[in-house]
């Protein structure tokens, strides 16, 4: 009864007004699964290929008509009739059909849309929520939200070179309370920025992009907001950074153009270690550039015992790159973005490999999102304990938080909030 009888791809708009792929998968019993594919602004060089048309007469070249055509034609022809519950078999067939190492022929956006829609259709057919269908009976851990409330780097037009400044309400007793804490801090920060004469418009991920001079200035503003909202930094709420260092790593050095500073590899590590010592920072994402394996090893040896070091551009949700990181003792956590690798099975494989090696996993959105809340279910399904899905503004971000609220309510007494145990520095 879970045989695939129809696959319908379409071009929709993401949160930045750019086209993306949405896919409906219809099963023999009438069950329907729908998935929309996200898109990143700062993308790693080793990510799977997001296929764009390149036709300047449509959407300034960013159309996804070729990917949609692949969904409606070649992909449906290949997997029509397959049983949707056989996810691994379907994903393997999609990879074989594409035939490239980076999904460059059909496009990761086409393959992922189908892969996720298949899982959602199968869950619907079984009468199960997606997190339970994918994760099984023990999927009940609600993740700590990593809320990006100040933006810099590629996500903002300000002098701050780091891309994201996040708060983590790890001391909260539940996900719902953690979300409330975050919202209260967000609004307190907004008032503080406004009172100081800063712009409070929000960026791609719902965070503020004030014209602050440095990372330290941003961290100080966030600390004050936490305290003014009535919470204790380093006890109730912790800080996190996404440096997105690949974006400013040029000619072997880290060139902070906004701040007017250049740091070599050793100086970059020393600077991050200094920030960890000075502030209650418990997680740093992409503290070193994606191919600076030497720098990553030095950073891990220096602060890895007291801070979560998350590889995003470094690992790109790819088991081959993660395997190298584990072998070399580089980083201690992986950021999981479904569209970096391009299928559900490969995403789950990356999380499983990380957990087996004692690495943490963080489920993540992209800066170009939709109302699709699949990653909320996947965060619970994988018991990863952390989710990164933006600030407390913009419905493309809050859609994921709201889905997690529903899941926590549905789980009732069996729900567990990951809290401090989710973070290597606090466990």
Curated annotation (Swiss-Prot):
CDD domains xrefs: enolase (cd03313)
Primary subcellular site in the record, as a coarse category: cytoplasm
SUPFAM superfamilies, alphabetized: Enolase C-terminal domain-like (SSF51604), Enolase N-terminal domain-like (SSF54826)
Keyword Lyase: yes
Pathway annotation from the record: Carbohydrate degradation; glycolysis; pyruvate from D-glyceraldehyde 3-phosphate: step 4/5
Catalytic activity of the protein: (2R)-2-phosphoglycerate = phosphoenolpyruvate + H2O
Cofactor requirements of the protein: Mg(2+)
Alphabetical keyword list: Cytoplasm, Glycolysis, Lyase, Magnesium, Metal-binding, Secreted
Catalytic machinery residues: 205, 337
Residues holding (2R)-2-phosphoglycerate: 163, 337, 366-367, 388
Gene Ontology biological process: glycolytic process
Enzyme nomenclature, EC number: 4.2.1.11
Entry GO terms, CC: cell surface; extracellular region; phosphopyruvate hydratase complex
MF annotations from Gene Ontology: magnesium ion binding; phosphopyruvate hydratase activity
Pfam families: Enolase_C, Enolase_N
Cofactor annotation comment: Binds a second Mg(2+) ion via substrate during catalysis.
Protein family per UniProt: Belongs to the enolase family.
Functional summary from the UniProt entry: Catalyzes the reversible conversion of 2-phosphoglycerate (2-PG) into phosphoenolpyruvate (PEP). It is essential for the degradation of carbohydrates via glycolysis.
Name of this protein: Enolase
Organism in which the protein naturally occurs: Xanthobacter autotrophicus (strain ATCC BAA-1158 / Py2)
Encoding gene (name): eno
